[in-house]
């Protein structure tokens, strides 16, 4: 996979999802504060409430103070900084001790109404001493965190890179905010933003002729597909997202499934659902570098997928229903589990081929390329009318709501980049970034700090 990384020509942004799910302190700190406050108000003796309130405030302030540094350590360590990776077990242990303290509060609070005054005083004293121990542990951890960050030369930089597109970022955030609102109202699966018509590539490894590293190659998996992000209901997480990819067999090639069917309507084949937790790297390259075709210069958005132990319930269901572990897909029209040995996928914007604009010689060259299913670059056309985009926009309630809001502000849709190019890879990129950010911290992007947003949006 190092060979693939060496071919990446533009910037990359890393998502430390696996670490943050286990070690994030912000969520644990807020839970402790809520449970502690509830215990003080409902179960603690009045004589102990003042002292308990003091240690609770100190604990909450300490956790809030170290959370930005802990988040920074997790992100940098996940990117391969060996000097900070040694701190990750310390952070995990601190998180475990906070969870233990939370369970201890629940244990002492259970049946408190039946306890005698002496037992209630004893329970409050135990909680007070346990909180003091946790505070001392946090205070001992702070110098180690500061020393490691200073030694590694890591700082909290909130300045955004020049490559960040403010317009695309605002458009993606608008989609995300509308979908969050609809999700809170319906509590059902909600699509995030528009559908993107893309060509899907996947990587595979094969033994090299020498004893060197594996030879990593790419193949075209779906010549045409509809990709979208959806927010799903999760029992363990407030924010949980899935990348859905539906193959469209109406791609200009011969398929038995499309015989006798109208060419204007989509004919769906295989389906993929990939948990966003598996995404660890997001980067741009060009299709020719993946497929060893020098003439191909189309931009491609590449995603690295990791195998995580704490898979979501959706992933477990897919794994249990898999019919053939040696095949990344199961029967057509079934939701399938993306096979764990596929480390990368790449997405290229799909273009229709306009037969009227292709000469005979060009048609022969194009057919030669398209006939090679393993290394073909998909159908393309540089002329797509705005009517197709307008139809795509009007089909989504969230997009209609945006259009209505723009109309109320007297903004002309015809002059909007968003309306003239809703299926661009850059919009998909920012949707993936923001959704991953919300799933990472389990809070809305509107509630995040500058450092949290900058750490995810900045490229390295």
Swiss-Prot record:
Q: Which GO MF terms does the UniProt record name?
A: GTP binding; GTPase regulator activity
Q: Which InterPro entries does the record match to this protein? A: Ran_GTP-bd-rel
Q: Which family does it belong to?
A: To yeast YGL164c.
Task: From the Swiss-Prot or TrEMBL record, give the protein name.
Answer: Uncharacterized protein C31A2.10
Write out the GO cellular component annotations: cytoplasm; cytosol; nucleus
Top-rank taxon: Eukaryota
